[in-house]
Design a protein with these regions (language model features):
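A "functional boundary" signal
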Residues: 1-212
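Selective detector of the "anchor" transmembrane alpha-helix that sits immediately C-terminal
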Residues: 217-223
């Protein structure tokens, strides 16, 4: 629910959950759900005091999560990778991602997630080509599996826009926007709206220029 922007509903469900009665094997799921909720809330709130409050709660639940996870579990590796990246150690994070990627089967939700997170690491390292490569792999997997969270695709669209490839940038962001609205993913609608407007404002004059024969800048595409 939190991933779809249904924060109030997600928070209410977690409030109704009696943590003390949960079996041990469900504790990682509980703490992970809490961590994701407050991470999303901290990202979207416009109030600085609430942002700090949500960030503190997200950190608290992340610490609790790490205490109940097996070090060999995929979620433990994912959280370790995120912590290394946040601490400014992208090379260490990439090494952990190497392990995760080696165990992620293509055309699975795990593969889509691991390749997306790998693209973020390459962004930190300033390796734009590898960032685009793994965004493309993640986006293709999302589409094949009908996953409606298109973070990979609209990030790729933004990169292509910055490189002047308006045709593909517009095509990808429009597809992402249409899918987001179809499934009423409110948080993604907010994220996509800004870059869609920016690309649209550039693309429409570009399209008119092509119609008059004056052409338009277009680069190579990752997809």
């Amino acid at each position: 629910m939190a991933s779809a922007g249904m924060y109030e509903e997600a928070a209410e469900l977690l409030r109704q959950t009696d943590k003390a009665s949960l079996p041990t094997h469900l504790m990682p799921d509980y703490y992970n759900a809490c961590h994701k909720l407050y991470t999303e809330l901290s990202f979207y709130t416009l109030d600085d005091s609430f942002k700090k409050h949500y960030q503190a709660l997200a950190t608290h639940y992340d610490d609790s999560l790490m205490q109940v996870l097996l070090p060999s579990s995929s979620l433990y590796l994912e959280r370790r990778e995120a912590r290394e990246a946040a601490a400014g150690h992208p090379d260490e994070a990439l090494s952990i991602n190497d392990t995760r990627l080696a165990h992620a089967k293509p055309n699975t939700p795990e593969y889509a997630l691991v390749t997306y997170q790998r693209s973020l690491l390459y962004r930190r390292l300033g390796n734009r080509e590898e960032e685009k490569r793994y965004l493309a792999l993640s986006a293709l997997t999302d589409i094949r599996l009908s996953i409606t969270d298109h973070a990979s695709l609209w990030n790729l669209a933004e990169l292509l826009y910055e490189e002047g490839d308006m045709e593909h940038a517009y095509r990808y962001i429009r597809f992402s926007w249409d899918e987001t609205n179809r499934y009423n993913a409110r948080s993604r609608s907010l994220q996509t709206a800004g870059i869609l407007s920016l690309i649209d404002l550039t693309y429409q004059p570009c399209a008119r220029s092509r119609m008059t024969g004056s052409g338009c800048t277009s680069g190579s595409s990752a997809l």
